[in-house]
Amino acid sequence: MKMIEAVIRPFKLDEVREALTGAGVTAMTVSEVLGAGPRSARKESYRGLEYTRLMPGIKLEVAVPDGRVDHVVRIITGAARTGRPGAGMIFVSMLDDATRVRTGEHGEAVL
């Protein structure tokens, strides 16, 4: 199993969610986040203090079986693409286990 974490532009959320749902991916966690990438990390100052301006984003977390990772990443990439810097990033990491709290079942069966 893998955990796919995608940080995308907020205005792309509906498009990405619809694309994932259309592909049968209905379970996901969505969070509002702030971040800065190498191109969007603008230094600003306020009252003599320097800080990096953080841009709003949406973080999607989706757990998928190993065999679906490439397909889901392609779906997110296609739906989230803006053609401009700051469109987002996708991270894929190992997921050792998952447990459904209601039933106690675990493993790929809960995905």
Put a short name on every predicted segment:
Residues 1-111:
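Positively charged, small/polar-rich N-terminal and surface patches that mediate targeting and assembly
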